Amino acid sequence: MSDDDLFLAGSLPAPLRQDRIVSIVEGAPGLVRTAALAAALGTSEVTVRQDLAALGLEARIRRVRGGAVRLGAGSRERPLEETAVEHQVAKAAIGRAAADLVRSGQCVVLDVGTTPAAVATALVAREDLTDVTVVTNSLTTALALEPAVPRFTVVVTGGTLRPLQHSLVAPFMGAVLPAIAADVAFISGTGLDVEHGLTNVNLPETEAKRMLAATAGRTVVVADGSKFGRAHLGVVRPLEDIDVVVTAGATADAVARIRAAGVAVVVADGGPHDAPARKDETA
């Protein structure tokens, strides 16, 4: 970039400067550091951080520690129906292992997602369970739990409907939660890594997951191996606030990294795999 270009970049109004940042980040193979962006645009790192924060909220780039990376294909929020046909065997195994952690008389929280829905299905199948209260903000999960009524009491949080996930979010989603002291929350996300913990691609869903987890004495993350090593826009729960991860289809290295960070990992399909997790071919 020439001296003239630097001068022009430094004097750009915020929208044009942010467009330039997106262009630089999208053209890079990996992380673009804040300092490099500041130098390229002829502006301060403080200004670049403010721009990155705004662009992250708009889901135009993904902010990470030290800079930004372009949005990958996995950073697009996908409909529940689309994700429901992926990793079905792994999700069913996770559901059964997670359901084994529940005892009669407990209050359980299930958030939105196809893996929590698998937990719901496994809970219903456990005919030994009685007097279980399940709190959820997922219409899909609530319907999956209906066959267990009256053995189970199913509480739907209320809130504002998001059709993409058939979920209930703020405003009003959190109104009932201060009255609930749950034993365990089973929470999912779109990413799980050591640096950020559990993350999710959508901010309203992230906030809902946060609020649900906060009602419970224990947080159990349910995530198949495809979620490991990914970080998305919203931080749901840092690793230090996660009690257990229940997974299937994860590599040995991925499981080892989470365990090394001090989090218990339950491998639901008998043991870590040496090959990367792949999509389940069963529709």
Region spans (language model):
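Conserved helix-loop-beta element of the AMP-binding
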Residues: 130-132, 245
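HTH-adjacent hinge/linker in prokaryotic transcriptional regulators
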Residues: 2-35, 39-112, 120-129, 147-151
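Rossmann-fold dehydrogenase core element
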Residues: 132-133, 154
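Conserved SAM/SAH-binding loop
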Residues: 112, 116, 138
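Conserved phosphate- and dinucleotide-binding cores of soluble alpha/beta proteins
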Residues: 2-35, 42-45, 57, 90, ...
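Short, Lys/Arg- and Gly-enriched loop/turn segments at beta-strand edges
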Residues: 119-120, 231
